[in-house]
């Protein structure tokens, strides 16, 4: 049976600069990831109906720590640092990418991975790589094509089918939805997916 969670009650739990610290959690977890400046913080704020729960910035790569938010006791959302930002120091960039892959391989409490993409520039190399790693580690993936308000309906539909085509060769049933923090497009589908994942009995 799928439980309906009240994401409006979500609150900040803790931050860590070491993603491996999450491996010691016993809570159910769903992680949000994506390239820098894709709008992860805005999506989390829209989901929880809280303007400042996750800090937003116009400067790409601002989230340099892992931020954990508690929906209710034992149920967490994880905001992972953006990957691939071009001006990030190379050593730091590869450190985070390595730790993210390690997290996907080792985290036993991860119920699903929400991969955000800017609908104007979807399926970058690192997006594909992260999705493939998730599939290999039997982690369910949900793709949000974010910033859909930046394009007209026809262009959004074209990008949607382009992403579908990219995923057609993968042996996994990955769901995709258009999303906008401005118009709230896709918010019901996002909540339904999170509810479904959190309701999975281990």
From Swiss-Prot:
Report the GO terms under cellular component: cytosol
- Fetch the CDD domains from UniProt: YihA_EngB
Task: Name any one GO molecular function.
Answer: GTP binding
Where do the annotations place Mg(2+) binding? 41, 63
UniProt xrefs under Gene3D superfamilies:
P-loop containing nucleotide triphosphate hydrolases (3.40.50.300)
Per UniProt, which keywords does this protein have? Cell cycle, Cell division, GTP-binding, Magnesium, Metal-binding, Nucleotide-binding, Septation
Q: What does this protein do?
A: Necessary for normal cell division and for the maintenance of normal septation.
The cofactors named for this UniProt entry are:
Mg(2+)
**Domain of life assignment:** Bacteria
> Does the keyword Cell cycle feature in the UniProt annotation?
yes
- Domain EngB-type G residues, every copy: 26-200
User: Record's PROSITE patterns?
Assistant: G_ENGB
Q: Which gene encodes it?
A: engB
The keyword GTP-binding belongs to this UniProt entry's keyword annotation: yes
Annotated InterPro entries: G_ENGB_dom (IPR030393), GTP-bd (IPR006073), GTP-bd_ribosome_bio_YsxC (IPR019987), P-loop_NTPase (IPR027417)
Sites binding GTP sit at 34-41, 61-65, 79-82, 146-149, 179-181
Q: What is this protein called?
A: Probable GTP-binding protein EngB
Q: Please provide the Gene Ontology terms (biological process) for this protein.
A: division septum assembly
Protein family membership: Belongs to the TRAFAC class TrmE-Era-EngA-EngB-Septin-like GTPase superfamily. EngB GTPase family.
What Pfam families has UniProt attached to this entry? MMR_HSR1
